[in-house]
Amino acid sequence: MSSGRLLLGATPLGQPSDASPRLAAALATADVVAAEDTRRVRKLAKALDIRIGGRVVSLFDRVEALRVTALLDAINNGATVLVVSDAGTPVISDPGYRLVAACIDAGVSVTCLPGPSAVTTALVISGLPAEKFCFEGFAPRKGAARRAWLAELAEERRTCVFFESPRRLAACLNDAVEQLGGARPAAICRELTKVHEEVVRGSLDELAIWAAGGVLGEITVVVAGAAPHAELSSLIAQVEEFVAAGIRVKDACSEVAAAHPGVRTRQLYDAVLQSRRETGGPAQP
């Protein structure tokens, strides 16, 4: 096995002080720092009062395939190569996968210096179930492809996390309403860890209306998983039984949701109203 090694360093999403001591040490001692944006990593090093000791090279999507051979050769010759993305953990919708795969194939040591990730940060503050989740990378840019992608996720039971451009967010949420249903709970996490961090929670219907006014910044979207059809129908039936006994719809939804972990009152309430619209039942609670 080569005496060199590959390090994957997680970088802060917005606050330099979120950098780990291990990342700081690696920036100072690595023989090569392969950065998604060389300007960004130099700015981070300056904020941390660190002098990057090794050679700095670019490693963004369009050049990664061209860099793999040279970086692997350096590692095989004993170099420590540190890979960093602009923000968060390399490889997760960022450069690094090709190099990691090549190093593993070559028997090279690969390790991660763990730290910030927009995926897990958004998930844990979304208020949505986090026991099981899936990450979908960036939403497709084109409308038809995006709608097809969302349609494939319509029956996904796990909470779903994905990235979206602020300029496409409104269109994406409108497509999500169409494909997933407007009652589905979700959260829009914007500018995570930064000065203007914002988390907007609500149904997809509500979030689509909110986003129509325009959104700025780095966006991570978290959407609740689908409830099983039979289970949802059963919950709606339980609510209607409470209503028939004289309990208000909202109170009935609270009672039923409290008895079923993972079910949110608002999600159930919206589902009851949608069911009533579809079956011709009373529109108002």
Curated annotation (Swiss-Prot):
UniProt-recorded Gene Ontology molecular function terms: rRNA (cytosine-2'-O-)-methyltransferase activity
Has the keyword Cytoplasm been applied to this entry? yes
CDD domains xref list: RsmI
Cell compartments where the protein resides: Cytoplasm
Gene3D superfamilies documented for this protein: Cobalt-precorrin-4 Transmethylase, Domain 1 (3.40.1010.10), Methyltransferase, Cobalt-precorrin-4 Transmethylase, Domain 2 (3.30.950.10)
Q: Per UniProt, which keywords does this protein have? A: Cytoplasm, Methyltransferase, rRNA processing, S-adenosyl-L-methionine, Transferase
* Matching Pfam families: TP_methylase
Report the InterPro entries cross-referenced here.
4pyrrol_Mease, 4pyrrol_Methylase_sf, 4pyrrole_Mease_sub1, 4pyrrole_Mease_sub2, rRNA_ssu_MeTfrase_I, SAM_MeTrfase_RsmI_CS
Known EC number: 2.1.1.198
Top-rank lineage group of the source organism: Bacteria
Catalyses: cytidine(1402) in 16S rRNA + S-adenosyl-L-methionine = 2'-O-methylcytidine(1402) in 16S rRNA + S-adenosyl-L-homocysteine + H(+)
Q: Which GO terms describe its cellular component?
A: cytoplasm
Decide whether keyword Methyltransferase is in the record.
yes
**Where is it mainly found?**
cytoplasm
Which PROSITE patterns did the record assign? RSMI
Q: Which SUPFAM superfamilies match?
A: Tetrapyrrole methylase
Instruction: State its role.
Output: Catalyzes the 2'-O-methylation of the ribose of cytidine 1402 (C1402) in 16S rRNA.
Membership in a protein family: Belongs to the methyltransferase superfamily. RsmI family.
Which PANTHER family does the record associate with it? Answer: RIBOSOMAL RNA SMALL SUBUNIT METHYLTRANSFERASE I
What name is this protein filed under?
Ribosomal RNA small subunit methyltransferase I
